[in-house]
Structures are given as structure tokens and as C-alpha cells.
Amino acid sequence: GNTVNGKIYAVPVAANVASSQNFAFNGPLLEKYGIDVSNVKDYASLEPVLKAIKEKDPNVVPFAMNKSYGGPSDDFDYVAVDGLPFVVDLKGDTTKIVDRYTIPRYVENLKTLHKYYEAGYIPKDVATSDTGYDLSQDTWLVREETVGPADYGNSLLSRVANRKIEIKPFTELFPHIQLAYTTPHRRQHRYTR
């Protein structure tokens, strides 16, 4: 099934072969309230930023997320789907599959997010909410986004939002599987780079 007259026809996917997790900040709100994000590098270092926006504008959600949030991002390669805890720890032994809940830095990030929830930086209805925090609105200050080199850093998110979005990576770039679509049956074949 994947050949026509003995030849394989495929359309490569022009996409990122690597990506990182980033905090995406609402640029107009950073400027309006004079909030500095230059020291943000992980979940723990977000606290002064979240506190500042909560004090300056209580109508803005400091850390936007809803019920689809799968937990803190980290340098993990998921061996199944994101909802399962089985990962390869890219900062640890990459020859083993482990439960992410046994990795101390992941547990610390969970504790940090819980602290933010209790402080009101994360929406109280996060577990049941379908609220989508539109990139183009001033309803949120920070959210998590996956960004790769083909996204040109801030520029793709800024173009989509039609406003400045400032990103701060908090994981390394890591390679991932891309798909090639072949004809005539549109089967998906996985390959890695």
C-alpha cells in the first residue's frame, strides 16, 4: 500500500524536530505594570511575578490553566501519553522508564504549584474549568507553551496573539518524533531525527 508504480511518495512535515517548555508572558501586561521576568527560570522563580500581578490587577489570572493541564512540565520523554506517569527522565538515566512521581524535582514542582493554588495565583476552579485563556486578551499573565526553533521564539506566539508575548524557557530543547504522511492511503509513518 505505500507505493505507486514502485515508488514511495511522502510529504515531510515541516515542523520542529525539537521543542522546549516555556513560560509565555502577556507582554502588554508586563509593560503596563512594570513587571520584570528576567529572573524567571523555573516554577519557583515565578512567585514574585505572580504576586506582583495579583496585587496590581486582581482581575487578571496570574497563572492561566484549566482542567486540561497535565501537571508541571519537565525534561521528560513520555513513553505513552502525557496523562500516564511513565517517563524517561532526560536529566537522569535515559535508559530507564520511571514513574515521574518518584523524581524529586517533579514532586517539588507539584508542591510549588499547590502553593500557588493556595495563594490564588492559579484559578480556584482549575480542576473543572474549561476556560480558554486567549492569547490576545488581558485575562492572564503567564501560561505554559511548547515552542521550538521553527516557531522563531517569541515571534510565532506574538503573531498569533497580535501582541507581544515574551517567552522564558524552563526546559532544554529535546528531540521528538515527527510524522511523514505517505500516499495513497495517508498512512502515518513515524521516523526520528
Describe the predicted segments one by one:
Residues 1-193:
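Extracytoplasmic/secretory soluble proteins
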